[in-house]
Amino acid sequence: MDNRPIGFLDSGVGGLTVVRELMRQLPHESIVYVGDSARAPYGPRPADQIREFTWELVNFLLTKNVKMIVFACNTATAVAWEEVKNALSIPVLGVILPGSSAAIKSTTSGKVGVIGTPMTIQSDIYRQKIQLLAPQIEVLSLACPKFVPIVESNETKSSVAKKIVYETLEPLVGKVDTLVLGCTHYPLLRPIIQNVMGSEVTLIDSGAECIRDISVLLNYFQINASREEKKADNLFFTTAGTDTFKEIANAWLEESIDVEHTDL
């Protein structure tokens, strides 16, 4: 048994979509979450800068004595996950491989769409992972640079959000039967995305898919938290103002949380 928390990092609030799934499926595990909203979005930034920022988040989590780190950010996973995983002695998970595997299982037409930040799409990592496992699948990738700012400003239900999502996704409509939400911010736009793509298209939440991998690694390394002892409080940190983060988190997690500011 290991009652240390699991660390989550993201460029902002998007990783809360992963945390919500963990709280549902592994409620006895405690969490330390850090979101770099002050420097979001990561997607348009150069790879070296994303790598630098990611290491700052990792080092912050290490000061909190975490037993595992989850990259709840596709952009950070695409750029820095491999490097961090190889450098640390604790397990480090990314969200891209679980999302790719789920897309392969889902598609019946052999045509999968992937949406993500400019850096995630530019890295071509989803297409590579999917076609490594299933070379016959056609992958259509689309960068959606305006989606993260909508989520970070808590405008997901606005008419502007609907217009932007519709205009951005138009090139994929009718061309795929499965769409990977290749950014953990995007599930917060899920109702609009589903409406635009059509009810027949399966949406893959890459972040939620990684919870199964977290559970497997907890068992493998025998670092599950005790179900008998009272778990530590979940901790949430943001590099930006706490009010917007808290508003989004309370609505998404369906509970009131405390959020602290950090300058890393």
Swiss-Prot record:
GO molecular function list: glutamate racemase activity
Leader sequence residues: none
Keyword Lipoprotein: no
GO biological process, one term: regulation of cell shape
List of residues binding substrate: D10, S11, Y42, G43, N74, T75, T184, H185
SUPFAM superfamilies with a match to the protein in the record: Aspartate/glutamate racemase
Involved pathway(s): Cell wall biogenesis; peptidoglycan biosynthesis
Record's keyword terms, sorted: Cell shape, Cell wall biogenesis/degradation, Isomerase, Peptidoglycan synthesis
The EC number(s) this enzyme carries: 5.1.1.3
Reactions listed under catalytic activity: L-glutamate = D-glutamate
Active site: C73 (proton donor/acceptor), C183 (proton donor/acceptor)
Annotated S-S bridges: none
Enzyme class: isomerase
Family: Belongs to the aspartate/glutamate racemases family.
Purpose of the protein: Provides the (R)-glutamate required for cell wall biosynthesis.
Name the record gives this protein: Glutamate racemase
Organism: Streptococcus uberis (strain ATCC BAA-854 / 0140J)
